[in-house]
Amino acid sequence: MLATDKKQEIISTYKLHDSDTGSPEVQIAILTERITYLTEHFKTHKKDHHSRRGLLKIVGQRRGLLDYLKKKDVERYRSIIEKLGIRR
């Protein structure tokens, strides 16, 4: 799970305006951080299939948000992909 200070740091980096916590960019960045954390977790805990199912759910959520952003604003989509280094 993400620590509160780490989550606040991500929000402050990707927010669009001062009170922004729920824009697609912020949500995608938070999900990407969780995916990175779980990926590292699986390097040492290979048989943790319960958490692996959660990872697949998070990846699906991020995929949906990315599809939404691509449909609404392609420039913002390309920007967040580049900033986060997501392969596409």
Swiss-Prot record:
<dbReference type="InterPro" id="IPR000589">
    <property type="entry name" value="Ribosomal_uS15"/>
</dbReference>
<protein>
    <recommendedName>
        <fullName>Small ribosomal subunit protein uS15</fullName>
    </recommendedName>
</protein>
<dbReference type="InterPro" id="IPR009068">
    <property type="entry name" value="uS15_NS1_RNA-bd_sf"/>
</dbReference>
<dbReference type="Pfam" id="PF00312">
    <property type="entry name" value="Ribosomal_S15"/>
</dbReference>
<comment type="similarity">
    <text>Belongs to the universal ribosomal protein uS15 family.</text>
</comment>
<comment type="function">
    <text>Forms an intersubunit bridge (bridge B4) with the 23S rRNA of the 50S subunit in the ribosome.</text>
</comment>
<dbReference type="GO" id="GO:0006412">
    <property type="term" value="P:translation"/>
</dbReference>
<keyword id="KW-0689">Ribosomal protein</keyword>
<keyword id="KW-0699">rRNA-binding</keyword>
<dbReference type="GO" id="GO:0003735">
    <property type="term" value="F:structural constituent of ribosome"/>
</dbReference>
<comment type="function">
    <text>One of the primary rRNA binding proteins, it binds directly to 16S rRNA where it helps nucleate assembly of the platform of the 30S subunit by binding and bridging several RNA helices of the 16S rRNA.</text>
</comment>
<dbReference type="GO" id="GO:0019843">
    <property type="term" value="F:rRNA binding"/>
</dbReference>
<dbReference type="GO" id="GO:0022627">
    <property type="term" value="C:cytosolic small ribosomal subunit"/>
</dbReference>
<keyword id="KW-0694">RNA-binding</keyword>
<comment type="subunit">
    <text>Part of the 30S ribosomal subunit. Forms a bridge to the 50S subunit in the 70S ribosome, contacting the 23S rRNA.</text>
</comment>
<dbReference type="InterPro" id="IPR005290">
    <property type="entry name" value="Ribosomal_uS15_bac-type"/>
</dbReference>
<keyword id="KW-0687">Ribonucleoprotein</keyword>
